[in-house]
A protein has these predicted regions:
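Class I S-adenosyl-L-methionine-dependent methyltransferase catalytic core
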Residues: 1-180
Length: 180
């Protein structure tokens, strides 16, 4: 599962230490399983929409000096959605985008990801690590191969993509528009 994968990444590439910074902390469920802490929380916690005490509002530039952070976890939204279905009152539609957030267009997603990558490159130490949790997505019937784009873009910003982990989904949320 994702928790085991993250623990493996931390052990392999961060000497078993916790992340120093998470800019997509939300309420910290990522660090828990069934209400039990299984991954140590980061020292610095940020989110676009802080929901709990101890989480700071994400603004750019981040309040860190250049080359000052050892490790970053980034688990951004991946859903591209807009329109009436976001506010139609149906609790079974747009589950992910309602729980976290979404981008209105593919361009918005790419701009956001690019902005974050550049800022992380600025604040990460030379031997620091960025864990960018992402997945491909579909919008308006078009596939967007996000992990491949992130690797390409990170490389062009100056990162060295050291590793890639893939978690295979056992199930998928399917749009209500799809008839099976």
């Amino acid at each position: 599962d994702q928790h085991d994968m993250i623990k493996d990444i931390l052990n392999l590439h961060n000497n078993g230490l916790p992340f120093e910074l998470d800019t997509t902390f939300s309420i910290g469920n990522f660090y828990q399983k069934n209400g039990k802490a299984i991954i140590e929380e980061p020292l610095y916690k940020f989110d676009m929409y802080p929901q709990i005490d101890g989480v700071q509002k994400l603004t750019f530039p981040l309040p860190f000096c250049d080359n000052s952070i050892q490790s970053i976890m980034f688990d951004p939204p991946f859903v591209i959605s807009k329109g009436d279905s976001l506010n139609n009152g149906n609790s079974r539609s747009n589950i992910i985008s309602k729980r976290f957030s979404s981008y209105e267009s593919p361009l918005d997603l790419f701009i956001s990801y690019d902005t974050n990558l550049k800022e992380y490159y600025r604040i990460l130490k030379n031997d620091g690590i960025l864990v960018f949790k992402c997945q491909g997505t579909v919008s308006s019937g078009k596939n967007f191969f996000i992990p491949e784009w992130v690797m390409w873009r990170a490389y062009h910003i100056g990162f060295y993509p050291l590793d890639r982990f893939e978690l295979i989904a056992r199930s998928r949320l399917i749009s209500g528009k799809v008839k099976t």
